[in-house]
């Protein structure tokens, strides 16, 4: 995936927990059980009744899907989830040990954080009492002139996501420096479309959202009439903000989200909001300029502040304070929040066990503290050394691929090769760990732990202003099951969490590892040359390095992918957005080709029969493609599929597998397909 590093206040769902110098009460909802081992190539997952040339995903994953229904505490279950659950269990082992018998001050810190989170008994006893100081701040607001200072306190001190995001990012046209930035935000539903589309499903969701808001206000003590009026205010304000929000697809274009302007321009866009008062209530120094990422949004926000009554604005702030805290308050709040956001929107049948939620929360707050011990126990040095060799092999293959492109001129190829040569690789974990010594954690006070963590994070980010960019910083924690390309750093990043089976396994043959982690590596590299990454140069600056003819040829080829994936239908009546998913689809296709090229190079060096030697009855090429498809094995709820089709830049696993192989003739050769079959179309889409 591609990540643009933008760090505002760390948003947490807050609550209070208490465990005076004792172990937190056991989680009554579940007892942690070590997940079963995971393997990279699973013959039993294959459904041999399916013709791989007709539906390769169903062939490679058919039996896995039949034998792995979605657990009741999930809305999606796939190979990523399998590894994620295993990594989370191993992280829990460290947290539980630190909560009961810490050996170092750092272990005590993250152990206390986890222990505080696990005290659900006290959360039930306290109800919404932990949130009363925040609600009192909102209630004290006596005029609109005080709104900006209050918003700053809610964002920075409490981590409450209201109106917009403020934080720090790399300057996209001068990547060596950090700048302040503001962007659209402030919506409770997943996307602007949920407010603006009038089809029956969206109308129903808005009705359910209002019902949720009414119930939330009533839990906080409002009567029926007041709760309904407040919910109406929330919907009206969020709908107005949604109308002023830039669509996701447009935000993929750096030019649409980069507006480096004087700080005073914010007052021109939104004069009803005192930006000077806002800034004075953050850790930020006086700003001369900043990136106003979505200018039209701030015009809409200004109209909201001007047109809505003070009481309506306070209802909006109050709702978001309650909503962000609800998952960690007493059981009625937790259940209500789960019922709408997970059950209604995502189709998840049951609440996730508290130990899982607290483990993930601790990783978010203190990820590089917990990660130090996790890496020592779960990521041996030889794993990093093996990854370094794989990355080098993939970089060599991508360079060869660029050189062989028939549609690109030598002039642009030279620039592309220079960008590839400038890639930086980060594998496993940071070279230098973050210092959490200034973050105070109390074993008996979760809500303030979360507030302090939010303030700690924004202070950490604001402190970067005016300083050189730290190119060694990570945007994911070590146990994360993911990987990313950061265009402003021109680097590829692979946390230790993903460097495990089914993606990477020491004992497996090269075909399996190249089909797993090899494709992931190639995927992240290709992001440097997709519809977004191709607009950044070797130094990470937005800068056109293409000839006009080559750019036109590139866009013609990517338009093929837009149309191809835009016709995939993950759920009845709803197709994928080919423009939203273009970057990930391009990276999937390019990553597959590059990894295959690298594998063939390795096999060629191993001897004459290496490319034909069968294991489990499959040639290396077949094992490569099956390994690739099996990392995408998954089952999804209908609700999850609908939300992700509208908001997720990644295609569902079925289309990530089939879409990539049907565009690659080498797949057809490996399985004896012929032109015209579904997995070997007459006119495949080929970019890289």
Describe the predicted segments one by one:
Residues 96-393:
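Noncatalytic, helix-rich "gating/capping" subdomain that lines the substrate-entry/channel surface
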Residues 30-34, 84, 234, 269-272, ...:
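Intrinsically disordered, low-complexity linker/terminal regions across diverse proteins
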């Amino acid at each position: 995936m591609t990540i643009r590093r933008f760090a505002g206040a760390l948003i947490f769902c807050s609550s209070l927990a208490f465990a005076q110098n004792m172990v937190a009460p056991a989680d009554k909802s579940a007892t942690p059980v070590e997940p079963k081992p995971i393997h990279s190539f699973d013959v039993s997952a294959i459904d041999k009744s399916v013709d791989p040339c007709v539906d390769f995903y169903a062939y490679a994953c058919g039996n896995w899907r039949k034998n792995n229904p979605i657990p009741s505490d999930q809305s999606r279950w796939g190979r990523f989830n399998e590894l994620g659950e295993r990594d989370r269990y191993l992280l829990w082992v460290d947290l539980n040990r630190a909560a009961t018998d810490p050996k170092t001050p750092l272990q005590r810190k993250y152990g206390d954080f986890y222990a505080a989170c696990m005290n659900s008994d006290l959360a039930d006893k306290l109800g919404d009492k932990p949130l009363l100081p925040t609600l009192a701040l909102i209630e004290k607001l006596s005029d609109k002139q005080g709104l900006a200072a209050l918003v700053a306190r809610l964002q920075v001190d409490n981590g409450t996501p209201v109106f917009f995001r403020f934080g720090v990012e790399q300057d996209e046209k001068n990547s060596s420096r950090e700048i302040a930035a503001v962007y659209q935000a402030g919506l409770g539903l997943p996307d602007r479309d949920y407010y603006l589309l009038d089809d029956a499903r969206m109308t129903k969701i808005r009705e359910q959202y209002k019902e949720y808001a009414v119930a939330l206000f009533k839990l906080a003590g409002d009567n029926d009439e007041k709760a309904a009026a407040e919910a109406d205010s929330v919907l009206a304000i969020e709908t107005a903000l949604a109308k002023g929000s830039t669509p996701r697809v447009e935000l993929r274009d750096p030019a649409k989200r980069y507006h480096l302007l004087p700080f005073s321009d914010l007052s021109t866009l939104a004069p009803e909001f005192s930006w000077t008062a806002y800034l004075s209530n953050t850790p930020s120094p006086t700003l001369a300029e900043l990136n106003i990422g979505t200018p039209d949004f701030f015009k809409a926000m200004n109209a909201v502040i001007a047109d809505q009554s003070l009481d309506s604005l306070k209802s909006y702030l109050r709702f978001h304070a309650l909503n962000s805290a609800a998952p960690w308050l007493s059981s009625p709040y937790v259940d209500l929040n789960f019922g709408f956001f997970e059950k209604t929107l995502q189709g998840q049948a049951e609440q996730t066990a508290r130990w899982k939620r607290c483990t993930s929360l601790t990783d978010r707050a203190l990820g590089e503290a917990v990660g130090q011990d996790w890496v020592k126990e779960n990521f041996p040095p030889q794993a990093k050394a093996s990854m370094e060799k794989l990355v080098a092999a993939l970089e060599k293959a991508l360079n060869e691929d660029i050189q062989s492109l028939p549609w690109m001129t030598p002039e642009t190829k030279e620039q592309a090769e220079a960008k590839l040569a400038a890639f930086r690789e980060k594998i496993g974990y940071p070279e230098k760990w973050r210092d959490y010594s200034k973050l105070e954690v109390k074993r008996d006070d979760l809500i303030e732990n979360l507030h302090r963590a939010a303030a700690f994070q924004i202070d950490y980010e604001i402190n970067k202003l005016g300083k050189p960019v730290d190119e060694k910083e990570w945007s994911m924690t070590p146990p994360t099951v993911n990987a990313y390309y950061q265009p402003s750093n021109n680097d590829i990043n692979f946390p230790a969490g993903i460097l495990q089976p089914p993606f990477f396994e020491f004992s497996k043959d090269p075909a399996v590892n190249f089909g797993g982690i090899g494709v992931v590596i190639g995927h992240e590299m290709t992001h440097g040359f997709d519809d977004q990454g191709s607009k950044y140069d070797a130094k990470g600056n937005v800068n056109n390095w293409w000839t006009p003819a080559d750019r036109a040829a590139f866009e013609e080829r990517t338009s093929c992918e837009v149309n191809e994936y835009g016709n995939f239908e993950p759920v009845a009546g709803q197709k994928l957005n080919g423009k939203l998913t273009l970057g990930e689809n391009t990276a999937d296709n390019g990553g597959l080709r590059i990894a295959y090229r690298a594998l063939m190079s390795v096999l060629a060096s191993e001897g004459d029969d290496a490319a034909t030697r069968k294991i489990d009855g499959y040639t290396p090429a077949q094992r490569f493609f099956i390994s690739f498809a099996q990392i995408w094995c998954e089952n999804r709820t209908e609700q999850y599929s609908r939300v992700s089709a509208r908001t997720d830049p990644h295609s569902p696993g079925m289309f990530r597998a089939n879409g990539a192989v049907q565009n690659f003739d080498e797949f057809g050769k490996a399985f004896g397909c012929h032109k015209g079959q579904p997995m070997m179309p007459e006119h495949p889409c080929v970019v890289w």
